[in-house]
Structures are given as structure tokens and as C-alpha cells.
């Protein structure tokens, strides 16, 4: 792989999607080949899995089922979209990757980070990001943002109680500590314009 694989992580309402849309024009005007994608999703098979994972009525979904579905969506997305783009020297900006599974299923769902990491090592064949930006935000702030966003569809994970969302953040902070060589923590509780500027600087300092 010749390209650069940058993943954007964070709890619900941290601004990942908006951030990526703000990063795209900057790198495009610099004539950098850049592509944005998301997990779960990005391609037809993985988008179908996303629909299953996000259905509000599927509250009975068991934690291992959830973890395996995310890993399956990740595998197909990786081989069908991400790896080919990296081979063509793209900068790939991905909304979520393996660290989401570690924080959500490994820590918040209680499956254990090591177990979930091994599932995802198998799914990704140890393909890891060049750089990960973790957008840190208090769960209450993130969920309040979601509540104000009339255009955002509320999914099954959004509906979890505040205790779950606090555990997700705790999990992420452990992931940041565990993979400090590739993860940079950025405060997401700031104006989006400033957040975009800060993340651009991090990407350029670390990779370009």
C-alpha cells in the first residue's frame, strides 16, 4: 500500500462526519488524491450490514453478534474500497475503524478489548491506519448535539443510556493510551472551523 490511511474516531455526536467533509476540500485544492468513506458502510454489502446494526427495533442484538457484524462489514469495506484506494496512492479519510469496535464492543459491551482486537486482526489482516484522530467529547455534550440535529437519523446505539455512552468514552481513552503511537487526541468541544484547522495541522505534521 502506497497511500495514507487516516481514521477519525469518537463517541456519538463528536463531529466526525462534519469534520471529514471539512477536510476534503482542503486536500483537494492541494491536488492530493483524497477519498472519504465510513464504517460500517462505504460499499453496498457493508451499507446493508449498517442498516441491520442501526435498526432501532433490534434491541435484542447480542454483543458478540454486534462485534462480528462490525468486523464483517469492515472486512468487505477494506478489501473492496480502502485497499484499492491506498494502492492508488490516495489519502483515505475513514469515519470509524477498528478503534470503534474496541471502545464500543470491547469495553462498553464488556467483551474485552483483547478478544475484539483479535476478531478484527483476522478481519483486517493486520491492516492498521497510518494515523487516527480521536475526537474527545463529554457524552452529554455529544448527545445534546444529536438531539439538536433534525437531519440526523437516531440509530440503535444513540438510544443507549448515558452510562453506556460514558463507558464508550472511557473505552476510547484506554484505546488512545494503548495505541499512543498512532492516535492523536483532539478536543471536539470547539467550533468546527477551529477543529478542522487543528486536524489539518496534525495530519500534515504527522504524515505529509
UniProtKB/Swiss-Prot annotation:
Task: State any single GO MF term.
Answer: ATP binding
Name the InterPro entries for this protein: P-loop_NTPase (IPR027417), Thymidylate_kin-like_dom (IPR039430), Thymidylate_kin_CS (IPR018095), Thymidylate_kinase (IPR018094)
- Reactions catalysed: dTMP + ATP = dTDP + ADP
Origin: domain of life: Bacteria
Its GO biological process annotations read: dTDP biosynthetic process; dTTP biosynthetic process; dUDP biosynthetic process
Q: Which keywords label this protein?
A: ATP-binding, Kinase, Nucleotide biosynthesis, Nucleotide-binding, Transferase
Query: Its Enzyme Commission number?
Result: 2.7.4.9
> What is this protein's name?
Thymidylate kinase
- The organism's lineage? Bacteria, Bacillati, Bacillota, Bacilli, Bacillales
Please name the gene that encodes this protein: tmk
Amino acid at each position: 500500500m502506497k497511500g495514507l490511511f487516516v481514521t477519525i474516531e469518537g463517541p456519538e455526536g463528536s463531529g466526525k462526519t462534519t469534520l471529514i467533509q471539512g477536510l476534503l476540500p482542503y486536500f483537494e485544492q492541494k491536488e492530493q488524491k483524497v477519498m472519504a468513506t465510513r464504517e460500517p458502510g462505504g460499499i453496498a454489502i457493508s451499507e446493508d450490514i449498517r442498516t441491520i446494526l442501526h435498526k432501532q427495533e433490534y434491541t435484542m442484538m447480542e454483543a458478540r453478534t454486534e462485534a462480528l457484524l462490525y468486523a464483517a462489514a469492515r472486512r468487505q469495506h477494506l478489501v473492496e474500497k480502502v485497499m484499492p484506494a491506498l494502492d492508488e496512492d490516495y489519502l483515505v479519510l475513514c469515519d470509524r475503524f477498528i478503534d470503534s469496535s474496541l471502545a464500543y464492543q470491547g469495553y462498553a459491551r464488556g467483551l474485552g478489548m483483547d478478544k475484539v482486537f483479535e476478531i478484527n486482526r483476522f478481519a483486517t489482516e493486520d491492516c492498521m491506519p497510518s494515523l487516527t484522530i480521536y475526537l474527545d467529547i463529554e457524552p452529554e455534550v455529544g448527545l445534546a448535539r444529536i438531539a439538536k440535529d433534525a437531519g440526523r437519523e437516531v440509530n440503535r446505539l444513540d438510544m443507549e443510556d448515558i452510562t453506556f455512552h460514558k463507558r464508550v468514552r472511557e473505552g476510547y481513552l484506554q484505546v488512545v493510551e494503548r495505541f499512543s503511537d498512532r492516535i492523536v487526541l483532539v478536543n471536539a468541544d470547539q467550533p468546527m472551523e477551529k477543529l478542522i484547522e487543528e486536524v489539518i495541522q496534525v495530519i500534515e505534521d504527522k504524515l505529509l
